[in-house]
Amino acid sequence: MGSLSIWHWIVVVAVILLLFGRGKISDLMGDVAQGIKAFKKGMKDDEKTAEKPEPVKTINHNADGSGAARSDTGSKVI
């Protein structure tokens, strides 16, 4: 009772074909194929952007302290 025979599968396929028709099923399969192609293209685009290294950023430091953060020692604190 738990297993489905070949006749069960034939009836299921026949009902699906009657409900959706041949045209709708082929359109659906075409849409699925387009979705898979778009997904694969997106994955390739992500790999291409991941392969490009970002340029190295340098930070200029001055030994005399110019350009360093200011201190507000001259302001009054009340």
From Swiss-Prot:
Spans traversing the lipid bilayer: 1-21
GO molecular function, one term: protein transmembrane transporter activity
Basic and acidic residues composition-biased segments: 43-55
Region (Disordered): 43-78
Swiss-Prot/TrEMBL keywords: Cell inner membrane, Cell membrane, Membrane, Protein transport, Translocation, Transmembrane, Transmembrane helix, Transport
First and last residue of the signal peptide: none
Subcellular location: Cell inner membrane
UniProt keyword Cell membrane, yes or no: yes
Entry keyword Protein transport: yes
Pfam family, one: TatA_B_E
GO annotation (BP), single: protein transport by the Tat complex
GO CC annotation, single: TAT protein transport complex
Membrane topology term: Single-pass membrane protein
Family assignment from sequence similarity: Belongs to the TatA/E family.
Job of this protein: Part of the twin-arginine translocation (Tat) system that transports large folded proteins containing a characteristic twin-arginine motif in their signal peptide across membranes. TatA could form the protein-conducting channel of the Tat system.
Assembly behavior: The Tat system comprises two distinct complexes: a TatABC complex, containing multiple copies of TatA, TatB and TatC subunits, and a separate TatA complex, containing only TatA subunits. Substrates initially bind to the TatABC complex, which probably triggers association of the separate TatA complex to form the active translocon.
Matches recorded under NCBIfam families: PRK00720.1, tatAE
Protein's UniProt name: Sec-independent protein translocase protein TatA
Organism listed in the record: Nitrobacter winogradskyi (strain ATCC 25391 / DSM 10237 / CIP 104748 / NCIMB 11846 / Nb-255)
